[in-house]
């Protein structure tokens, strides 16, 4: 069953064909045990893959592929990493990317493909001053 409307499919195919320059890897971590939204998340990813040949999938089992879990520092499932062909930008989505999160994952795919972001020059300048690793976490609720 399709999760995206036909209108959304047409829009996203056009958007991706016009705006994706470089290949993007979706790295998906699932778990066979106790993963409430792994199936639905995989269904969304499968639909995204059908929209552009510049998007590919690498899939891991959180419980079995422990080296990959360690390499990508994955904390829970379902987990989606949006990465470039040869670079992991640290973008992680935990849980199902539905609602407002779907728009965010589309933006992440476009930004990774174009090796850009939406940061101002001033913000980029300030970020260059940071000398220690840090972790930004954004929590979203539908209310």
Give the role of each language-model region.
Residues 1-25, 101-133:
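N-terminal leader/targeting and pre-domain segments
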Residues 4, 37, 78, 97:
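Catalytic cores of large soluble enzymes that bind and process phosphate-bearing ligands
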Residues 10, 14-52, 128-143:
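Local sequence-structure signature of Cys/Sec-based thiol-disulfide redox active-site neighborhoods
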Residues 36, 56, 93-96:
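Short coil/turn segments at secondary-structure boundaries
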Residues 39-46, 67, 78, 103, ...:
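N-terminal, well-ordered alpha-helical segments
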Residues 54-87, 124:
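Thioredoxin-like thiol-disulfide oxidoreductase module
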Residues 79-117:
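Non-catalytic, surface beta->alpha helical segment in thiol-disulfide oxidoreductase systems
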């Amino acid at each position: 069953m399709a999760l995206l409307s036909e209108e959304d499919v047409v829009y996203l195919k056009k958007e991706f064909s016009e705006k994706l320059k470089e290949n993007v890897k979706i790295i998906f971590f699932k778990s066979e045990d106790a993963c409430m939204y792994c199936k639905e998340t995989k269904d969304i990813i499968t639909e995204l893959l059908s929209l552009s040949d510049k998007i590919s999938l690498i899939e891991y089992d959180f419980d079995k592929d422990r080296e990959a879990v360690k390499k990508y520092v994955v904390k829970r499932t379902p987990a989606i990493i949006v990465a470039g062909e040869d670079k992991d930008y640290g973008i992680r989505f935990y849980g199902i990317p539905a609602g407002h999160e779907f728009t965010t994952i589309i933006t992440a795919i476009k930004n990774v493909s174009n090796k850009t972001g939406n940061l101002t020059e001033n913000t980029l300048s300030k970020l260059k001053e940071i000398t220690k690793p840090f972790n930004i976490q954004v929590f979203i609720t539908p209310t």
